[in-house]
Amino acid sequence: ILLIGAVVVIWKYTPGNIVDKASELFNESDGKVVHKKRVVLNVPLINQMDDPKLYNGCEVTSLAMVLNYNGIDVTKSELADNIETVPFQYDNGEHGNPNDGFVGSVSGSTSAGLGVYHGPIYKLAKQYADNVYDLTGSNFDTVVNKVEEGHPVWTITTTAFAPVSDFESWDTPDGKIDVTYSEHSVCITGFDRDKRVIYVNDPYGYKNREVDWNDFAAAYKQMGKQAIYVTK
């Protein structure tokens, strides 16, 4: 990219984080900022399958990573104990709604479970942090910009990190909703604009896992554009 006019190179270093050395280029002639090409935040990895196992606990485990990164000492198990829950299935045959609480069992050790969406996760995060922001509904570029600013982002995706076709319709107390057992939650930790990849801490045990940018953005959209971040 050819920049016309005076250019100021601003180098910001955060211990433990990898940032492209030409991190921000400010073009004084037109006031535009050229975004960082690559960012990888050093977010602590928490594995939902480590003891005590949370077979269905990707959402609370990913939230624990975000909170830990921001200096908040909380475990996945504590979050699992404190997340609002709803039954997997009521006596009348209706299912719980993940917008109201975690559907079923978070641990998955004794009964079925599905997952939970951004609303209950936001409420849970507010119990531990003052500065919690719900980006739900924002386009994916906005999410990436928050990571660029140094904030790991909790989000809902799929186990394929791409759109899926295995949705089914559930009757809930709030009406019909479409759900998928492929629903997954991760912590977005970085990106590479040249390689067109997103980096995530996957609570299945993968730190800074590299996934395709376009596929991940499409899954983000399919799953309702759900995202939350925290600041100190």
Name the predicted role of every residue range.
Residues 63, 82-83, 137-138, 156-160, ...:
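Active-site-proximal beta-strand/loop segments in catalytic clefts of secreted hydrolases
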Residues 1-119, 159-161, 166-170, 179:
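Active-site-adjacent structural segments surrounding the nucleophilic cysteine of cysteine proteases
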Residues 54, 151, 182-184, 196:
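Envelope-exposed proteins and targeting segments
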Residues 61-73, 82-89, 124-131, 145-150, ...:
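Structured segments of extracytoplasmic/periplasmic soluble domains
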Residues 96-182, 191, 230-231:
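Predominantly the structural core of cysteine protease catalytic domains
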Residues 54, 58-63, 75, 79, ...:
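Stable alpha-helical elements in mature extracytoplasmic
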Residues 169-180, 189-232:
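Noncatalytic regulatory segments and standalone regulatory/sensor domains
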